[in-house]
């Protein structure tokens, strides 16, 4: 997986954290196409190609997802469970990015099918350094699965 061909869906409800993550990714040298969704409902709409995300040229299928756990209107675990139950989304790598270090949250995330669990550092420099390592692993060393094309014809009922 190469960064310039990689679309990352950032599912995060805090607009300040969205900006912070995008800036840290850029400063880490990762030229990813970042799309964001501020809720579980928006992420589901993005993944299934519902309006306003129907244009796949503008809203490509993500190669990976950075997912917050605690959001209003549904948790990251809810989205992850939904994704893993669907043929068209189950192979998309999901990396939890949460401020929670609670072992119960970590265990629930892995039980639901996350591929990695990262704890958001408080300091920006530490976040940037985390994304340098993230990029090396996910974009240089990891061999990604083939993802099904998600189109309106492959969308399964929720």
State the predicted function of each range:
Residues 5-16, 21-26, 65:
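Conserved acidic segment of CheY-like receiver
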Residues 36-52, 76:
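Helix N-cap/capping motif at the beta->alpha junctions
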Residues 39, 60-63, 75-78:
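Acidic catalytic/metal-coordinating carboxylates
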Residues 42, 122-134, 142-148:
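C-terminal output helix
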Residues 52, 77-90:
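Short amphipathic alpha-helix used as the core "switch/output" element in two-component signaling
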Residues 67-69, 98:
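Active-site residues of response regulator receiver
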Residues 72, 102:
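The feature encodes the CheY-like receiver
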């Amino acid at each position: 997986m190469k960064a310039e061909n990689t679309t990352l869906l950032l599912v995060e409800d805090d607009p300040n954290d969205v900006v912070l993550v995008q800036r840290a990714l850029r400063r880490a040298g990762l030229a990813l196409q970042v799309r964001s969704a501020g809720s579980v409902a928006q992420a589901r709409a993005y993944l299934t190609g519902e309006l306003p995300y129907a244009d796949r040229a503008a809203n490509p299928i993500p190669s990976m997802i950075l997912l917050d756990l605690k959001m209003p209107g549904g948790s990251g675990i809810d989205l992850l469970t939904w994704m893993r139950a669907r043929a068209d989304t189950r192979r998309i790598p999901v990396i939890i990015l949460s401020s929670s270090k609670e072992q119960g949250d970590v265990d629930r995330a892995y039980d639901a099918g996350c591929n990695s669990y990262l704890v958001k550092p408080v300091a920006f420099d530490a976040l940037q350094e985390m994304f340098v390592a993230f990029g090396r692993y996910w974009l240089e060393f990891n061999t990604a699965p083939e993802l099904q094309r998600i189109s309106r014809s492959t969308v399964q009922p929720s």
